[in-house]
Amino acid sequence: MLILTRRVGETLIIGDEITVTVLGVKGNQVRIGVNAPKEVSVHREEIYQRIQAEKKQKKS
């Protein structure tokens, strides 16, 4: 796992087309913005896990 430190307003670049920007920090919450092409799915982990569980149920 790569661990990086960013300040508010700073950006990470993933590949050629994805950027992740730190928008704000309040207490233990960090707001981030993600710019990615439409063909790249971006989900919070808990939403992604729910989607995967639903896909698994449909296969059963």
From Swiss-Prot:
Annotated Gene Ontology cellular component terms: cytosol
Keyword entries, A-Z: Activator, Cytoplasm, Repressor, RNA-binding, Translation regulation
Segment forming the signal sequence: none
Domain of life from the UniProt record: Bacteria
Molecular function as annotated in GO: mRNA 5'-UTR binding
Similarity annotation: Belongs to the CsrA/RsmA family.
Classification lineage: Bacteria, Pseudomonadati, Pseudomonadota, Gammaproteobacteria, Enterobacterales
GO terms, biological process: mRNA catabolic process; negative regulation of translational initiation; positive regulation of translational initiation; regulation of carbohydrate metabolic process
NCBIfam families: csrA, PRK01712.1
Protein's recorded name: Translational regulator CsrA
This protein's encoding gene: csrA
Xref: PANTHER family: CARBON STORAGE REGULATOR
Its biological purpose: A key translational regulator that binds mRNA to regulate translation initiation and/or mRNA stability. Mediates global changes in gene expression, shifting from rapid growth to stress survival by linking envelope stress, the stringent response and the catabolite repression systems. Usually binds in the 5'-UTR; binding at or near the Shine-Dalgarno sequence prevents ribosome-binding, repressing translation, binding elsewhere in the 5'-UTR can activate translation and/or stabilize the mRNA. Its function is antagonized by small RNA(s).
The protein's assembly and partners: Homodimer; the beta-strands of each monomer intercalate to form a hydrophobic core, while the alpha-helices form wings that extend away from the core.
Compartments, record wording: Cytoplasm
